[in-house]
Amino acid sequence: MQILLATVAAYLIGSVSFAVVVSAAMGLADPRSYGSKNPGATNVLRGGNKKAAILTLVGDAFKGWLAVWLVKHFGIGGEIGVALAAIAVFLGHLYPVFFRFQGGKGVATAAGVLLAVHPALGLATALTWLIIAFFFRYSSLAALVAAVFAPVFDVFLFGTRNNPVAWAVIAMSALLIWRHRSNISKLLAGEESRIGQKKTDA
């Protein structure tokens, strides 16, 4: 019962869309109404408000970290509990019950989850994102590369462990890549927006 409650709680935590909440609190346009229509930090940045984008990034990462940390801290369900919390908070961000199941792509939330699973895993994945984003200026490309490398880092740090947490990392990476399928098409067509590019309603 504890595992079930923790999993539901993690999903509800993930369902809090900081892009929408922060934008509303600051009197800004709903990020689902412009740019990529994605309620995430990158699209909020396209709206031209760096403070809102930073708050969104921190909030989305924090909720991912919090959901997993709580399960680990209280020892709920061991590795199975951690894995379920990780997937649940991630799915909550992707399909939030509070926002008609229309959520973001999960990059910041996944980073928070990985930091809670193990700081080295989270930092290595975040650093990969930063390097690709810095040199290529594509948030989506950075996210895709980081998603590919997250399971690789997991194996490098912990070996070929056959446990629920490792499978949760793989599942999140696969879901993140799938959520970026439209971005992949735009990248291949040379139509993807770069980091910091202003919003358009088209």
UniProtKB/Swiss-Prot annotation:
Sorted UniProt keywords: Cell inner membrane, Cell membrane, Lipid biosynthesis, Lipid metabolism, Membrane, Phospholipid biosynthesis, Phospholipid metabolism, Transferase, Transmembrane, Transmembrane helix
Matches recorded under NCBIfam families: glycerol-3-phosphate 1-O-acyltransferase PlsY (TIGR00023)
Q: What does this protein do?
A: Catalyzes the transfer of an acyl group from acyl-phosphate (acyl-PO(4)) to glycerol-3-phosphate (G3P) to form lysophosphatidic acid (LPA). This enzyme utilizes acyl-phosphate as fatty acyl donor, but not acyl-CoA or acyl-ACP.
What topology does it adopt in the membrane? Multi-pass membrane protein
Q: What is the protein name given in its UniProt record?
A: Glycerol-3-phosphate acyltransferase
Supply the EC number(s). Answer: 2.3.1.275
Listed under subunit, the entry gives: Probably interacts with PlsX.
Q: Which molecular-function annotation in GO is an example for this chain?
A: acyl-phosphate glycerol-3-phosphate acyltransferase activity
Which pathway does it serve?
A: Lipid metabolism; phospholipid metabolism
In terms of InterPro entries, this protein maps to: G3P_acylTferase_PlsY
Q: Which gene encodes it?
A: plsY
Subcellular localization is given as: Cell inner membrane
Q: Which GO terms describe its biological process?
A: phospholipid biosynthetic process
Query: Can you tell me where the transmembrane regions are?
Result: 3-23, 51-71, 74-94, 116-136, 140-160
Task: Give one Pfam family.
Answer: G3P_acyltransf
Question: What is this enzyme's catalytic activity, as reactions?
Answer: an acyl phosphate + sn-glycerol 3-phosphate = a 1-acyl-sn-glycero-3-phosphate + phosphate
> Which HAMAP family does this entry report, sorted A to Z?
PlsY (MF_01043)
An example of a Gene Ontology cellular component annotation for this protein is:
plasma membrane
What is the scientific name of the source organism?
A: Burkholderia thailandensis (strain ATCC 700388 / DSM 13276 / CCUG 48851 / CIP 106301 / E264)
Q: What family does the Swiss-Prot or TrEMBL record give for this protein? A: Belongs to the PlsY family.
Q: What class of enzyme is it?
A: transferase
